[in-house]
From Swiss-Prot:
One of its GO terms (molecular function) is carbohydrate derivative binding. Its EC number is 2.6.1.16. It comes from Chlamydia caviae (strain ATCC VR-813 / DSM 19441 / 03DC25 / GPIC). The gene is glmS. Keywords: Aminotransferase, Cytoplasm, Glutamine amidotransferase, Repeat, Transferase. InterPro entries: GATase_2_dom (IPR017932), GFAT (IPR005855), GFAT_N (IPR047084), GlmS/AgaS_SIS (IPR035466), GlmS/FrlB_SIS (IPR035490), Ntn_hydrolases_N (IPR029055), SIS_dom (IPR001347), SIS_dom_sf (IPR046348). Residues 280-426, 458-599 form the SIS domain. GO terms for biological process: carbohydrate metabolic process; fructose 6-phosphate metabolic process; protein N-linked glycosylation; UDP-N-acetylglucosamine metabolic process. CDD domains: GFAT, SIS_GlmS_GlmD_1, SIS_GlmS_GlmD_2. GO terms for cellular component: cytosol. Homodimer. It is found in: Cytoplasm. This is Glutamine--fructose-6-phosphate aminotransferase [isomerizing].
Length: 609
């Protein structure tokens, strides 16, 4: 949830670290800080708020250092204050650490250190790392062995960086079930939670695997070990992103830019995985066999869970294989039945979602037939830990509320359904080609939808509302769930979603005169049922905003306002309706004057429980 950055090289370290932290703010922005080694001591500066606050506090400082670490925080242990901000130092200010993750046994370690006479200055779990390392280092005088020993005492998921005032040429770092990437430049090196933070300097990286530490020296010298200090050889690879991918490119917000990038992202995946006849290409999950499993278990969090929920409807209708969808944070503690012939599908934009990675461990423990990952980051823990991985290829997504990554997930899951139908021969060639034709048309339909002025202006009439009800059925229900989540995330509106058929079982009691109800009517199989539900809430004087296909103009007779979506193949329509929900949330947040890219209390990558 936090962002770590470190630099060692010939440049002045502080400006490099500040720039790197600015690229990591999507991971947390409660507070920020940095520490640098200057002659015979550490320089430490911390502020509450965003990286710009930290930068402003350093404008008049001259920090002659070539080694520094920095941190931008999303609070888990301890409220956002200067004392709880990172970096944390030991009681003698000899070493400084930055940390992302949670130390599960910090209370025991803290009590042990206090019994040794060591004083703590913060409420965080992270300070334990600095104090424990200093305690060991004082006894042994060995920097690397003390670091290794400290790591062996920690329980939990974490990544960290450490510097010491007496070692101005060494940057230590480690990862345990939390991402940390090393960047290798010309006589300089970087560490970061995300490689995007140092792309302006280098595209050569090494990703630390769980249970690995690195000793980074001047001149791009990197030695990698496991926590027991057994040397590990790691290959250097090149990342494909460019620093320009992180720019807004003329848009007011990253979220808006990423909404408008969706047609291109979808078109790229469609042309990669469909042949000219509209059939699924052999390159899609090449070597994948359906004979190994008889059920599917999908596990994810947040928006990715909604994508998995839609996949359940699609796959079960195309292939007649039972599909179970679980929230990862519940799955890991539920003691669910998991058969040996299960295909496990784990979905995570970042590939670092803590609960989803815990589910991966559980599936491995249960020895399921196959584990498939769907994510956007090739060097992520999810991508490297599964049997097969489908990459979103959505490019960098910086807006905290997922847009293009989510629709790419939907597309890959639709393609997965078609792949399974091909392998099981449950779809005729004509039906398959009709689906393919619908997919080929999708990017242009997205562009048409994005040009709909009625959609962009809807918030003008509803920006004073503080509660919405979303209703959908079948394929539209998971998409309504996602639309409601988007309104919560960035417009801070209480938006509740229900299957339309459940209204009479309780939620209809919430309806009073003028209650805004948004209905997604795009599934033709249940269109008449949706009309019936609209009439039910209208009878209770609700104000109904109907989102429907262009061919469903009769919806105007039973609703108060309408947003029309281009006609499309039923399998494709959920993606178009998703974009409607994104624009609704964006325009509402814009009208209310909220910070769209960095909504309160949220972070892009949820790397802790």
């Amino acid at each position: 949830m936090c962002g770590i950055f470190g630099y060692i090289g010939a440049k002045l370290a502080v400006p490099v670290v500040l720039d790197g932290l600015a690229k990591l703010e999507y991971r947390g922005y409660d507070s920020a800080g940095l520490a640098a080694v200057i002659p015979e001591r550490l320089f430490v500066r911390k502020t509450v708020g965003r990286v710009d606050e930290l930068r402003s506090s350093l404008e008049k400082e001259n920090v002659p250092s070539s080694l520094a670490i920095g941190h931008t925080r999303w609070a888990t242990h301890g409220v956002p204050t200067v004392k709880n901000a990172h970096p944390h130092v030991d009681e003698n200010s000899a070493c400084a650490i930055v940390h992302n993750g949670i130390i599960d046994n910090f209370k025991e370690l803290r009590s042990l250190l206090i019994s040794e006479g060591i004083s703590f200055s913060s409420d965080t779990d992270s300070e334990v790392i600095a104090q424990l390392f200093a305690f060991r280092y004082q006894a042994t005088g060995d920097l690397v062995h003390s670091f290794s020993w400290t790591l062996s005492q920690l329980q939990g998921s974490f990544s960290c960086g450490l510097i010491h005032k007496d070692h101005p040429n060494v940057l230590l770092c480690a990862a345990q079930e939390s991402p940390l990437i090393i960047g290798l430049g010309e006589k300089e090196s970087f560490i970061a939670s995300d490689a995007r933070a140092f792309l302006k300097h280098t595209k050569s990286i090494q990703a630390l695997a769980s249970g690995e530490l690195a000793v980074v020296g001047l001149g791009s010298e990197v030695e990698t070990y496991n926590f027991a200090l057994k040397r590990i050889h790691k290959e250097v690879r090149q990342v494909v992103y460019t620093d320009a991918d992180s720019d807004k490119q003329g848009y007011s917000y990253y979220m808006l830019k990423e909404i408008y990038e969706q047609p291109e992202v979808l078109e790229r995946l469609i042309h990669k995985y469909l042949d000219q006849q509209g059939c699924i290409s052999e390159k899609f999950l090449n070597g994948f066999s359906i004979e190994d499993f008889d059920e599917i278990s999908i596990v994810a969090c947040g928006s990715s869970y909604h994508a998995g929920f839609l996949a359940k409807y699609i796959i079960e209708s195309l292939v007649s294989i039972p599909v179970h969808v679980e929230v990862a944070s519940e799955f890991r503690y539920r003691q669910a039945y998991i058969g040996k012939k299960t295909l496990a599908i784990l979905i995570s934009q970042s590939g670092e979602t803590a609960d989803t990675l815990a589910a991966l461990k559980e599936f491995r423990r249960r020895q399921v037939a196959c584990v498939l990952g769907i994510c956007n980051v090739e060097e992520s823990a999810l991508a490297t830990g599964v049997d097969h991985c489908l990459f979103l290829e959505a490019g960098i997504e910086i807006g905290v509320a997922s847009t293009k990554a989510f629709t790419a997930q939907l597309l890959l899951l639709i393609l997965l359904g078609l792949k399974l139908a091909t392998l099981k021969q449950t779809l005729s060639l004509e039906e398959h080609r009709a689906c393919g034709k619908g997919l080929f048309e999708l990017p242009e339909l997205c562009n048409r939808l994005l040009a709909n002025e009625n959609l962009h202006s809807w918030a003008n009439d509803y920006c004073d509302e503080d509660r919405f009800i979303f209703l959908g059925r079948r394929l539209m229900y998971p998409i309504c769930m996602e639309a409601a989540l988007k309104l919560k995330e960035i417009a801070y509106v209480e938006a509740n979603c229900y299957p339309a058929g459940e209204m009479k079982h309780g939620p209809i009691a919430l309806i009073s005169q003028g209650s805004p109800v948004i209905t997604f009517c795009g599934d033709p199989v249940v269109y008449e049922k949706m009309v019936g539900c609209i009439m039910e809430v209208k009878a209770r004087q609700a104000h109904v905003i109907a989102v429907a296909s262009e061919s469903q103009e009769d919806i105007a007779a039973v609703s108060d306002a309408q947003i029309y979506v281009p006609n499309s193949h039923p399998l494709v329509s959920p993606i178009l309706y998703t974009i409607v929900g994104q624009i609704m949330a964006y325009t509402m947040a814009l009208k209310k004057g909220y910070e769209i890219d960095r909504p309160r209390n949220l972070a892009k990558s949820v790397t802790v429980e």
